[in-house]
Each structure stands twice: as C-alpha cells, then as structure tokens.
Amino acid sequence: MPALPLDQLQITHKDPKTGKLRTSPALHPEQKADRYFVLYKPPPKDNIPALVEEYLERATFVANDLDWLLALPHDKFWCQVIFDETLQKCLDSYLRYVPRKFDEGVASAPEVVDMQKRLHRSVFLTFLRMSTHKESKDHFISPSAFGEILYNNFLFDIPKILDLCVLFGKGNSPLLQKMIGNIFTQQPSYYSDLDETLPTILQVFSNILQHCGLQGDGANTTPQKLEERGRLTPSDMPLLELKDIVLYLCDTCTTLWAFLDIFPLACQTFQKHDFCYRLASFYEAAIPEMESAIKKRRLEDSKLLGDLWQRLSHSRKKLMEIFHIILNQICLLPILESSCDNIQGFIEEFLQIFSSLLQEKRFLRDYDALFPVAEDISLLQQASSVLDETRTAYILQAVESAWEGVDRRKATDAKDPSVIEEPNGEPNGVTVTAEAVSQASSHPENSEEEECMGAAAAVGPAMCGVELDSLISQVKDLLPDLGEGFILACLEYYHYDPEQVINNILEERLAPTLSQLDRNLDREMKPDPTPLLTSRHNVFQNDEFDVFSRDSVDLSRVHKGKSTRKEENTRSLLNDKRAVAAQRQRYEQYSVVVEEVPLQPGESLPYHSVYYEDEYDDTYDGNQVGANDADSDDELISRRPFTIPQVLRTKVPREGQEEDDDDEEDDADEEAPKPDHFVQDPAVLREKAEARRMAFLAKKGYRHDSSTAVAGSPRGHGQSRETTQERRKKEANKATRANHNRRTMADRKRSKGMIPS
C-alpha cells in the first residue's frame, strides 16, 4: 500500500481524557510538544566575562532546542514548525540579530566563536528541512499542500529569504539555490510578494538620497517638507551620521547581491520596476558625494575613515555586480541559449537599457572597468546579423566619452573603481593601502573569500615635518645611495610605508612612474609659509594705529583712561560749521520760487517767452497748503463751519451716548416739550423697558423662543407631544438658564442628611 502524504495522513491515538481511541489528522495542534524556544541575542561586543557567560548560556539553550527539533520524526517536526510560535520567533531573532560578515566586530573568545558556528549550522539545517517537502518515499507532503503550508503559516517570506541568502550564501550556494528554488516553485505567490517588496527596496535608495540632501529621480520626487529644507550634505553632516549611512548602504547592496546571485530568476521581477535605471541614477548621485565627504575628512579619525572607504568601495562593487547580474539574466543568457529567431527582443532590451544610461558617465566608466561593454556588444554582433550598428556605435562612443581625461589603463588593471582617476587627473579616492594591493596580487584566489575586502583603502593625512624626515631617514639608512627626493616620491606613492618602499626597491618591483625617476634626485625644500601675524586682514587693517603696517604711531592721540581734552574737543566740534557751509550752496539751489528775480540793466527773462501763459492756474486752489498755526482768523472761519457753543445750546446731549438711526427718527417726531409728570405711567415704563430689552437682545443675536409648552396637563391625564419635547429641551439646555445642577445638589444634600426627608 503506497504511503499517504502527511497532509492526508490520519493517525489513531488514545484520548487522554476518555481513554478511548480516536482518529485525528497527523498535522494537528495536539501533536505539538510543549517546549519553549528562547530568543537569540548577538554575542557581546566587549569580552566581559559576565556577558560572555550569559551569551553562552542562552546560545546553548537555542542550540539544544534546535538539535532536539531536527531529531524529531517527520510528522512531529512539521507539527512543531507549524503550530509553535516560539520556534518562529527564535528563528526570526537569529536572522535579525546575528552578525553579518561585513559588520563591525571585535575578536571574540574561542568559545563564543565555536558556539556561533554551532548555531549557524543548526539554524541552516532547520530552514533547509523546512523547505523540503519530500524527505523519503514514506515521509513527504504533497507539493500543493506544501506551498499552502509555507505561505499561510508565514514559514518563509521575502525578508527571511533575503537574510538567508546573505547569511548562508557563502559556502552553501548549491543547497541554498535548491532550497529557494523549491520555495518559489511550490508557491508562486512569493513572486507577487517580491513584486510588492521592490518599491520598498527602491525606497531605501530614495531615503539615502534624501538623508544626504541629494535630489533623487525627478519622476519620483515628492513635495519637499518644510523640516527637510535644511538637510546636510555628506560633507557637512557629522562623522557618525555618515558612518550610519555608509553601513546602511553596504548592508543593502550586499543583501541584494547575495539574493540575486543565489536566485537569478528574480531578475525579471526586478526589471519590471526599471531597477537598472534607478540603480545607475542612485550610483551617479550618491557615490561621488560620499567619496568626496570621506576625502575631505582626512584629518579626522583615520582608522574609522579607512573602514568607511573600504565599505563604500565594497558597496560600489556590489552595485555594479547587481547591474551585471540583471543584465546578464534578462538579456545576455537568453541570447546565448535561444535561436536566431527569438533573440531580437533581448537585443532590443539590452540596447534600451544602455541607451537610458548614457548620461550617467561615472557609472558607465566604473561598470566598463569591471565588465567591458565592448565585449557584450561584440557578443550581440556575433549573435545577430541584423544588429543596428548605429545604436551600438553610439553606445560605444558614449562609453568612450565617459573615459575622457581618465587613466583607463590603470583603472582596467586594478579592476576596481576606487583607483580610477577623475577627469582632472587627480586620483579618485584615497590611496590604496599597500597591504591590500600586495594581498590581491599574491593571493588572487582569496579575493572572493573576503567579500568585504574589495578595493580596501585607508585614509591617512599627508606626512610633513619631523614625521616625514623620520620616514626618509629610515629608508636612507638602509639605502644610502638614494636621493631624498626619490625616497619622498616612493613614500608618497606607497602611502608613506617605508617597509613597502624598501621591499619594492630591493626586489626591483617599483611602479613604472617611479622607475623612470632619477634615483639621485634631491629633495626640494619648500619655503616656509607666511607668518600668520603679517598676513592678517581685519577692519583695522592699515589704520593709523596698525603697528604691523607702520613703524611710528602718533602717541599724542593715545591716552589711558578719561581724556582731559574732552570738553575742548566737544566745544570745537560744535563750533565747527564747515559742513553746514559746504551744504548751504546746495540747499540754496532748491529755492527756485522767488518773489523777485534780480536782473542786470538790459537783461530779460530767457524763459519768459516760452513758458509764460496768461491763463490763471487754479490746480492747487482747493488744497490746504501750509500749517494751520500760521493762518489768519478769517481763513480758519472760512474753512470751518460755524457751530453754536455748548453753553448756548438749548439741549445738551450726554457724552458717549450712541443712538441708532431708528431712535433718531423717533426723537425727531417727539421734539416738542413734554410735561414733567411726577409719576409716569407704569405701562409706558414697562413698554420702554421691554423695547430696550428686545433691542439689546437683537444686538446680541438672541431670539427668545416663546413657543414653550411646559405647563402640561394635570397628573394622570398624560402629556402632549409638544409638552414632552419642550421639557426634554429644557432639561438639555437648563445650563443656559442659570440652573447649575440644583436638583443634583439638592439630592446630594438630602442623601447626606443635611435636609430631613
């Protein structure tokens, strides 16, 4: 009888409560063992004995639990994996907190290293068994049910898969490729999850650009927030903040490269989001700025800056390798594997990608240094006889133009963008360390083992003074026939490493630029810089008291404390009318309107015949010109209407009394004198008071609702609907009538015995 898959298998067991036999599915929560998996924590950064002991104890629990899990039979294993939430949290904590190979770390104790290796192996075997649906011919799960179990129970997701690739891809590539391929094959829904995850991955690049104060892709920019207007550039931000950005970029690039290297079938999903163009534009905008920021901080922490430069170089290399993997998977491999009839679409895709990147000159130059574009185009020419030569020539010409002014031979030999020179001829980056160069040349097979060592470079300040003289003397003591100028050139080339200079000179392995120099070249002594005090510039430069620019100073104008000549100086200053006399003639020119124009005998007005008009000019007659205090009494009377003095008026109105238009009209009708009653009519007084109250309420905007029907009917006869509504309205709005919870407070007093009930 053939064995049934685990998802269809039924097992018979005894009910612990009734003692009777019953049948239940093999995958059931009751089959789960009662075991708690503790969370993983990373090893301590400081080798403090107490922290190391705590880590070893916790890691031992995790390792023992995983070993117990791996030893379970097929059905028990899957019940524990599916229904035990603590197991999933334990595995997630390991993927999240375990140190990556490119993370900062210190030398751990040997027992910590051994425990890390044991945990690493146990976690990998656990995920490997979780991704296998058939262990043997008797223990397996049907493929359709296996995919549903993985997807519905969140045993795998895209972030977990990315972490698995970056953690276990080195050394376990075949097993990891089979594992992830099986997951995507049995559950195609992970492709849609990856498609939904890619906008988040692209947002990582946008966040880095925004945090660096760089403008991203114009098609994807959003309105800028007010608090984002003052963002710092990489050159201005603090060093620790720059360090966080570089580490974040290094982690992102390494993770994406590891995933695409393990599972290249995901390249199609990446390219759906125009990933190649977004990657190249990010490289062009961010990488040069970060390089410049590191180079400008040469005088700061050299060890930290060397580590940042190494990680940035590693990130650059991974970005270009990601681009190459995608290009190779979606264009080049299909061309090599397909027939001649089916390759035109892939060739068009290749040409379209590079046509969109022609303005990214820095990216093209660095990519061409690692993966020559001419070789790929040569492959296209061999595969297709109808290739558009105009487009290919245009792309090659754009790549060549990106190399203008750059030492291409040096960059191609290095096979790394960190040694490429800028168009101005200066090295693009900090000098590469001699140790990294020697290791790369003598052990090329180890370059792939240390992924983080790609293009290792260190930042160091330029030597000068006593330090430089000491280095030159170290070399000259062993090689006295060499000139100091030649030794200085060698030290500058090999980053001031005297051991490397001596070794290369003795082994005749100097760089070509150094071999052409004269070995007896003398050292050129640089002139001393200008002293600071003789080159200062401020607001007192070259004044009468500047002792740095003149030898003699008028000491009579220098006094200590209060000057004795202050009174004389003040009086002489007030009596000095030279400034007034100098301005008098200028202001006299403004008096162009005069009553009489003095003329010499026989002279006439030169402008009389031109500007004279016999018509009277009344333009300004209606304007009041001049001050009122200089006017005569007649003019004041003519301008101001005559009014009766207050003392002569028959009726004196009260000051500050404001009356409306309606009241004025009523007063106009009642101007006749009224008899003075000793006691006025109360009805008239009530009408006036009511009128004043209604006028006041009208000004306040209040409208009294006179349609109240709260009287109601006698008790026992029921109430009308209007009465009920009015009572409800009165109860809801009683606060407007100064009823401050009287019923509530009265009940409270009565309940406390204040008022006898």
Curated annotation (Swiss-Prot):
Gene from which the chain derives: ASCC2
CDD domains in alphabetical order: CUE_ASCC2
Organism this protein belongs to: Homo sapiens (Human)
User: Which keywords fit this entry according to its UniProt record?
Assistant: DNA damage, DNA repair, Nucleus, Phosphoprotein, Transcription, Transcription regulation
**Protein's recorded name:** Activating signal cointegrator 1 complex subunit 2
Q: Where in the cell is it found?
A: Nucleus; Nucleus speckle
Q: Which family does it belong to?
A: Belongs to the ASCC2 family.
Q: Which positions are tagged coiled coil?
A: none
**Which intervals of the chain are annotated as region Disordered?**
617-687, 699-757
Positions of post-translational Phosphothreonine modification: 233
Q: In which tissues is it expressed?
A: Ubiquitous.
